[in-house]
């Protein structure tokens, strides 16, 4: 177990030399804009309103894109100058290497979600949202969005470690994120589309009663956990057979 955390520490050290931390604050910062502009005629600003409008931009567009960017950056160093061969020649197992990269991706996404919560609380304070703060709703939304990112992160890691090109996985990820607005309207396909799941998990119940947003959270989590197992096992299998 100690070797696994040492690999994680080395991954963190590699990421500290990049501009990845600027990307971490990107989506929460952009989500501030719709929160600042949200208003309904004759209605007071509520925490549910702020969470709804800020999570649309954050969960529907930027969070899925960030998962792909993080995965591509995590694998970028190994794709250069025979990095995979050098890394796997060390006394470490492929499973530990793969899982350490996955842990780094979901840790970065966790930091993104925490920053989103901070921005949401700050915007609520600035807009003088109706008290008290609904901590249970906000925390369930933020944590649920992070959980819903886990299968997408596993899928993106599987693609990024398999393709040596840095831009190809990103282009694929963006192209599959763009249809989110349409797919989220489908109660049939929306819950099973990994790029939509973070937004579905983050949207407060009762705010968007249409399409896949009608799906109960517990049913969505069953789909998410099932997808996570499939994508993570498949990624490990292909990485285990990867020629270096």
Stretches with model-predicted labels:
Residues 1-25:
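Aromatic- and glycine-rich beta-strand/loop motifs that create alpha-glucan
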Residues 17-41, 55-70, 171-181, 226:
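Hydrophobic alpha-helical transmembrane segments of multi-pass membrane transport/permease proteins
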Residues 19-20, 81, 93-95, 99, ...:
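Membrane-helix interface segments
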Residues 29-67, 99-163, 207, 214-218:
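Secretory targeting signals
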Residues 34, 38-50, 170-244:
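Terminal transmembrane helical anchor/hairpin motif
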Residues 74-106:
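Helix-loop-helix units of permease transmembrane domains in multi-pass membrane transporters
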Residues 77, 90, 121-125, 161, ...:
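Transmembrane helix-loop junction
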Residues 151-181:
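Functionally important transmembrane alpha-helices
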């Amino acid at each position: 177990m100690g070797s696994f955390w040492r690999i994680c520490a080395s991954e963190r050290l590699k990421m500290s030399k990049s501009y990845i931390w600027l990307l971490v604050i990107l989506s929460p910062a952009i989500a501030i804009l719709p929160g600042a502009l949200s208003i309904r005629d004759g209605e007071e600003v509520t925490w549910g309103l702020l969470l709804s409008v800020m999570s649309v931009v954050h969960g529907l567009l930027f969070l899925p894109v960030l998962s792909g960017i993080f995965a591509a950056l995590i694998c970028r160093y190994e794709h250069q100058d025979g990095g995979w061969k050098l890394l796997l020649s060390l006394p470490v197992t492929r499973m530990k290497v793969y899982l350490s990269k996955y842990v780094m991706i979901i840790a970065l996404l966790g930091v993104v979600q925490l920053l989103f919560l901070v921005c949401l609380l700050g915007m609520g304070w600035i807009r003088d949202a109706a008290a008290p703060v609904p901590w249970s709703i906000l925390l369930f939304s933020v944590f649920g969005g992070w959980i819903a990112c886990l299968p997408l992160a596993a899928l993106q890691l599987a693609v990024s470690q398999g393709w040596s090109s840095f831009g190809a996985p990103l282009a694929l990820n963006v192209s599959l994120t763009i249809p989110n607005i349409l797919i989220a309207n489908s109660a049939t396909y929306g819950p099973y589309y990994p790029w939509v799941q973070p937004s579905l998990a983050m949207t407060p119940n009762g705010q968007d009663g249409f399409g896949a947003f009608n799906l109960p959270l517990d049913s969505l989590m069953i789909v998410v956990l099932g997808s996570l197992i499939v994508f993570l096992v498949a990624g490990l299998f292909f990485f285990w057979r990867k020629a270096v």
